């Protein structure tokens, strides 16, 4: 059955969806492609996709934020292979660009209130509610994963900083201990310690090292064989009497 052309509105396609479709179709965009059946998008290399392709699709640089955007536009993660990043939307298919603006399935999904959910359940649209709850669960799971990753990264950084500070403290303590020996007093710094050593009391059993005192008023006598003792002096007094 042919779809009515009035249902198609190309102008209503969000820019995010158009950029995502272009990136999935073109092989030059790395890290993302179609699944073999052309019904789902497959992000086969997350690191390459985040580094090279994601900046061309969205302003975000975090994969978790990108997944939340997919969920907000109605994409659901495939249950076939849980460890693979495969997402699908019924109107996002390879070679079917006309489906992008067919209805509101690729429009931004607003969070529904619990009262709206109860009303829809009463109307019998249980399948839609289950799909909505699944999308919300995926979104919360992604947010939790992002928060966990950030916490682990912060813990690693903090542990590394503590280790560096510990090494610096140990090194400084060893250097300070090698320069300053224990003493009877506790100097505030190395200069106080040095001055205290100079002005401190002498240790027991030690005498000051000083030259012997000599009275300058008494000249030192020297004796020569057969001679008269006389004082060693460079100059002699004319009135000097050796027999006085």
UniProtKB/Swiss-Prot annotation:
Source lineage: Eukaryota, Fungi, Fungi incertae sedis, Microsporidia, Unikaryonidae
Family: Belongs to the HSF family.
Name of the gene encoding the protein in the UniProt record: HSF
UniProt entry tagged with the keyword Transcription regulation: yes
Residue numbers spanned by region Involved in trimerization: 123-168
InterPro entries named in the record: HSF_DNA-bd, WH-like_DNA-bd_sf, WH_DNA-bd_sf
Classification via Gene3D superfamilies: Winged helix-like DNA-binding domain superfamily/Winged helix DNA-binding domain
Cell compartments where the protein resides: Nucleus
Name of this chain's protein: Heat shock transcription factor
